[in-house]
Amino acid sequence: MSKHPMTVEGAEALKAELHRLKFVDRPRIVEAIATARAHGDLKENAEYHAAREQQSFNEGRIQELEAKLSHAQIIDISKLPNNGKVIFGSTVTICHVATGSELTYKIVGEDEADIKLNKISYSSPIARALIGKELDDAVTVETPGGMVEYEIIQVQYIVE
């Protein structure tokens, strides 16, 4: 399986969730199963079945996070040369050529992308068009509404 880029912040967030699932949620669920089991007949014990379902979900999420972390290529933006090029992890401000409106995005891994926080995946159409370009370059992005042209007006390497 190939490696997937991830920022240091993204990896730390996944590690924190994994730690919580293993050392907080897992013991709590095991205790809930034991308590429900003590109530008697397991066939009609909704509390027991709910706890087992929760355990199954928790263990599945643990496996998912471990797989993501094992296949992550963690990229520390602070260790990369700041040469004004748009790269994974950089924060880019672009200007819509036709309207003059400005947008700022941070290019992150797929698991970290959140458009509400202006974080876009490196595999998104906008990020693919921006990566490798430099300050003042014009880029054309294919959108559902057609081709849109942007100008790169700022490239920052911000470590959160």
From Swiss-Prot:
Key word Transcription present in the record? yes
State the similarity comment.
Answer: Belongs to the GreA/GreB family.
Extract the InterPro entries matched here. GreA/GreB_C_sf, TF_GreA/GreB_CS, Tscrpt_elong_fac_GreA, Tscrpt_elong_fac_GreA/B, Tscrpt_elong_fac_GreA/B_C, Tscrpt_elong_fac_GreA/B_fam, Tscrpt_elong_fac_GreA/B_N, Tscrpt_elong_fac_GreA/B_N_sf
Query: Which gene is transcribed and translated to give this protein?
Result: greA
Give UniProt keywords alphabetically. Answer: Coiled coil, DNA-binding, Transcription, Transcription regulation
Q: What does this protein do?
A: Necessary for efficient RNA polymerase transcription elongation past template-encoded arresting sites. The arresting sites in DNA have the property of trapping a certain fraction of elongating RNA polymerases that pass through, resulting in locked ternary complexes. Cleavage of the nascent transcript by cleavage factors such as GreA or GreB allows the resumption of elongation from the new 3'terminus. GreA releases sequences of 2 to 3 nucleotides.
Q: Which GO terms describe its biological process?
A: DNA-templated transcription elongation; regulation of DNA-templated transcription elongation
Q: Is this entry keyworded Protease?
A: no
Q: Which Pfam families match?
A: GreA_GreB, GreA_GreB_N
Give GO terms: molecular function aspect only.
DNA binding; RNA polymerase binding
Q: What is this protein's record name?
A: Transcription elongation factor GreA
Q: What HAMAP family does its record include?
A: GreA_GreB
Give the residues annotated as coiled coil: 50-70
